[in-house]
Structures are given as C-alpha cells and as structure tokens.
C-alpha cells in the first residue's frame, strides 16, 4: 500500500466521498455540541474577552483572587495574548463570543488546509476532528486550541523557512507558554535564523504589551500563575499524575509520578531532536508541549491530530485510533485514555521515523517530500 493513499480497491470512490462525509460529520457533530452548549458556550472565551475589556477600561487584567485552575473567569494567559483578544472585546455580547468561535473554526480549517500532507489525509483529519470530543469541546468553550493547532501546523509546513518558522513558534508561545519548548528543538537542530526570528517576535510582543498594559501587569501575571492550587488535585486534570490521584493513589506518590512523567517527556524531546528527522523532532516537541503542562485538560487532545496526520500520511492507518480513543462516541472510556493517547502520539512518530546512529546536530534540514511534490 502506498503511504498516504486510502487502502482498498474502492479507494477512488472513497476519495470522492471522503470530503462530503468529513464535512457532514464535522458540521453535524460540532453544530450539535454548540447548539446544546447553553451557558457554557464561550466559557473560556469570556475570560479572554473580559480580560481584554479590563485592559480597555484601564483596569488590572488579572484577578489574583482566583486560585483554582478551571474556575469561571480565570485568566492565565500572557499580556501579549490579551492584545489579540481586544478586537473581539470591542464587539457587543453575544456577538463577541460568536465572532471568537467563528475565528476558531476558521483557524482550524486553515491549519488543516496547510498541513504538509496529501489531500485525502487532510479530509481524514477533518473527519477525525468532527468525531473528536476534544475538538468540539474546545470550540464550545472558545478555547485557544484551534489557534495553537494553526501555529503548530504552520511551523511544520514552514520548517525550512526560518523567518516564518520563528514567527509561528513565537506566536504559539504567546498563545500558550508551553510551545516555547519548540525553541529548544530549533536550537538542537541548529535553526539559528528561526530562533533569532522567533525571539525577535517575542521581544516585540513583550515590548508592545508592556507599553500598552504596563510593567506591573507582568508581576500580576506571575503572581496568579504561582497562586493556582496544586495541579495534581485539580478536578478534570488528565495528566498521568492527576489520573493516578483520581484512581486512588496518594497525593505524594501521584506527584512523584508526575515528576517522572515530566522528566521522561523532556528526555524524549531532547533525544528526538538530535536522533530523528527534523519533522519527527518537531512533532515530538509539539506533542510534548501539552504533555508537559501541569494541568492537561481533555480539549488539549485535539492537538494530537497533528502527529496523527503525519502517521496517516505514511500509511499507518492504525494512527486514527489515537483521536478516535477520545472521540465523542467513546466519551465513556476512563480518564486514563488521555495520557495513554498522548504518550502513543509522542512515541509513535519516533518509532516510525527514528534513525539509529545518526545525529542530526550535524545534519542540514531536509525538505518535506510532500511539500516538494506539491505545487
């Protein structure tokens, strides 16, 4: 079977039907989730928009009285990200949330269209997203997952275009701090121009945010990050340590397990950066950026569509089980499915693409064969 081609003798017919099925499923499922959301529609988006409105009103952006992750109105994002929400905050309710939700759908659609994989794989990703509970949940909440997915997809596509790659890494880091680990990958693969471009974008964003929001805003941001209660005991947290705690393991041992998880993930990222292909190293870092988070919400799993696309492109059709394990039809599965899915997505590209005995520190970046063949 040729990698990236739909299996079976009916592949041409499947290829023609796939876009229709993918669109119908995605629109139906996501539409149903949004229609039934009620007051939870835009739950996270409202926190972003209110922070932007506080900025517009000259008030303090961060509410340091909240100390529970996931609490209503909690805003943990960086000052530069607040500026991105300002245009939406200028709109009246409920148009602000509607516009934000539409922007998330557009961002995800653009990301899928730009994935450096073949057309049928892109439509498979749309289909899997339509079935994905994490994706529907992220859109319902107005969470930043689709924006981050776009940044990561752009970084993958622009891997050999340093300025664009650097900008994509920087914007991803502004959206969520954890993708900053991509800079480690870029350093280890000697993408100095991309690192420089990314740091320049970050420096510019910090300077603008400081001028607009004030120097004290950074202190308030760090204060609220420090004040959030213990992540292991946070409800609905899907890190390995938190899942073990929910299953009955003591807080101390669960915390130790989470430390082991973090150290192991970091070690794998470093190893993948220097011992596998640039693409595998990048996707490993992208997946790890979420698995390293002290609080792993279920909607973060929508980002696993990225390594899934890479695996499907190479004919590993079993990879569809990664997002399907957290699909809306299997929502009854136990919480442990989330850390397992993340770890499979982290290790599978390495297992498929590892090149033993070859160090990429001395290797020039390789062009993606899919991009090279596309017009």
Residue ranges and their predicted role:
Residues 2-165, 189-313, 358-375:
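Primarily membrane-embedded glycan-assembly and transfer machineries that use lipid-linked glycans
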Residues 143-152, 172-178, 241-253, 322-341:
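Contiguous hydrophobic segments
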Residues 163-186, 285-292, 325-328:
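Membrane-interface alpha helices of multi-pass inner-membrane proteins
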Residues 174-177, 204-208, 318-319:
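Membrane-embedded alpha-helical segments of transport systems
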Residues 312-375:
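Aromatic-enriched
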């Amino acid at each position: 079977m040729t990698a990236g081609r739909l299996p079976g003798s009916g592949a041409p017919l499947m290829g023609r039907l796939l876009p229709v099925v993918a669109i119908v499923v995605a629109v139906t499922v996501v539409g149903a989730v949004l229609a039934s959301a009620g007051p939870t529609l835009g739950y996270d988006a409202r926190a972003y928009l209110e922070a932007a409105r506080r900025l517009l009103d000259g008030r303090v952006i961060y509410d340091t009285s909240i100390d529970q992750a996931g609490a209503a109105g909690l805003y943990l994002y960086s000052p530069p990200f607040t500026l991105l929400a300002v245009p939406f905050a200028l709109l009246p309710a409920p148009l602000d949330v509607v516009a934000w939700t539409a922007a998330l759908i557009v961002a995800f659609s653009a990301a899928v269209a730009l994935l450096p994989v073949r057309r049928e794989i892109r439509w498979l990703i749309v289909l899997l997203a339509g079935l994905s509970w994490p994706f529907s949940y992220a859109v319902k909440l107005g969470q930043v997952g689709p924006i981050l997915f776009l940044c990561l997809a752009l970084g993958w596509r622009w891997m050999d275009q340093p300025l664009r790659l650097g900008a994509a890494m920087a914007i991803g880091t502004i959206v969520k701090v954890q993708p900053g680990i991509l800079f480690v990958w870029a350093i280890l693969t000697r993408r100095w121009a991309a690192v420089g471009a990314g740091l320049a974008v970050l420096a510019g964003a910090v300077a603008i945010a400081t001028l607009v929001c004030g120097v004290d805003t950074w202190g308030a941001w760090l204060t609220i990050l420090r004040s959030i209660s213990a992540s292991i005991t946070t409800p609905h947290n899907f890190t390995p340590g938190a899942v073990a705690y929910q299953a009955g393991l003591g807080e101390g041992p669960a915390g130790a397990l989470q430390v082991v998880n973090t150290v192991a993930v970091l070690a794998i990222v470093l190893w993948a950066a220097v011992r596998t292909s640039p693409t595998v190293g990048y996707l490993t870092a992208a997946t790890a950026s979420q698995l390293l988070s002290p609080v792993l919400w279920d909607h973060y799993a929508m980002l696993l569509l990225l390594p899934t696309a890479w695996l499907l492109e190479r004919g590993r059709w079993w990879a569809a089980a990664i997002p399907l394990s957290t699909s809306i039809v299997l929502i009854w599965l136990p919480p442990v499915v989330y850390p397992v899915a993340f770890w499979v997505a982290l290790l599978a590209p390495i297992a498929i693409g590892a090149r033993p005995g070859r160090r990429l520190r001395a290797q020039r970046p390789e062009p993606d064969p899919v991009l090279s063949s596309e017009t």
